[in-house]
């Protein structure tokens, strides 16, 4: 298990929500190699105690990262860094959300792709 709490820094005075600060720092830790794929993370309660956050705040960060495919929970064994590239998982989640929104608004595939191309330019 990694000592995630040793390098996570939460700024309670920031405009950015606490759960999002933690979420971003976990992603950064994966990208820069501090957290390798398969690394077991501290339990929600352990990390909350170590960094001084509420249990629900840490749980929300873990849930959102799990939904994006960045983390995976293996029942009673704990929460681990997923084996997939977090950028791939995050982009897939964003693409799925965009596609869902486009479908619900009745936007055609071609029009939806034009929105993407315009946003990338």
From Swiss-Prot:
Question: Where does the record place it?
Answer: Cytoplasm; Secreted, Cell wall
Q: Which Pfam families match?
A: GntR
Q: Which PROSITE patterns match?
A: HTH_GNTR
What does the UniProt entry report for the null mutant?
Deletion of the gene has no effect on the growth, morphology and intracellular structure of the cells. The deletion mutant is more sensitive to vancomycin. Disruption promotes resistance to aminoglycosides via manipulating purine metabolism.
Q: Which residues bind DNA?
A: 44-63
Q: Name the source's superkingdom.
A: Bacteria
Q: Which SUPFAM superfamilies match?
A: Winged helix' DNA-binding domain
InterPro entries in alphabetical order: Tscrpt_reg_HTH_GntR (IPR000524), WH-like_DNA-bd_sf (IPR036388), WH_DNA-bd_sf (IPR036390)
Presence of the UniProt keyword Transcription regulation in the record: yes
Which CDD domains does the record associate with it? WHTH_GntR (cd07377)
Single GO term (MF): DNA-binding transcription factor activity
- Show the GO cellular component annotation of the record: cytoplasm; extracellular region
Which residue intervals define the domain HTH gntR-type in the entry? 16-84
Q: What Gene3D superfamilies does this protein map onto?
A: Winged helix-like DNA-binding domain superfamily/Winged helix DNA-binding domain
Keywords assigned by UniProt, alphabetized:
Cell wall, Cytoplasm, DNA-binding, Secreted, Transcription, Transcription regulation
* Matches recorded under PANTHER family: HTH-TYPE TRANSCRIPTIONAL REPRESSOR YTRA
The record's function comment reads: Transcriptional regulator that modulates resistance to vancomycin and aminoglycosides. Negatively regulates the expression of several genes responsive to vancomycin, resulting in decreased susceptibility of bacteria to vancomycin. Negatively regulates the expression of genes encoding the ribosome binding protein Hsp, the small subunit of sulfate adenylyltransferase CysD, the L-lysine-epsilon aminotransferase LAT and the protease HtpX. Also modulates purine metabolism and aminoglycoside antibiotic resistance.
Q: What is this protein called?
A: HTH-type transcriptional regulator MSMEG_5174/MSMEI_5040
Its taxonomic placement starts with: Bacteria, Bacillati, Actinomycetota, Actinomycetes, Mycobacteriales
């Amino acid at each position: 298990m990694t000592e995630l709490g040793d390098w996570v820094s939460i700024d309670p005075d920031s405009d950015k929500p606490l759960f999002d600060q933690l979420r971003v720092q976990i992603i950064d830790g994966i990208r820069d190699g501090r957290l390798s794929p398969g690394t077991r993370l501290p339990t929600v309660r352990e990390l909350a105690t170590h960094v001084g956050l509420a249990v629900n705040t840490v749980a929300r960060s873990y849930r959102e990262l799990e939904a994006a495919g960045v983390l995976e929970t293996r029942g009673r064994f704990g929460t681990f860094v997923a084996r997939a590239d977090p950028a791939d998982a995050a982009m897939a989640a964003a693409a799925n959300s965009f596609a869902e929104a486009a479908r619900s608004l009745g936007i055609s595939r071609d029009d939806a792709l034009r929105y993407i191309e315009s946003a990338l330019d």
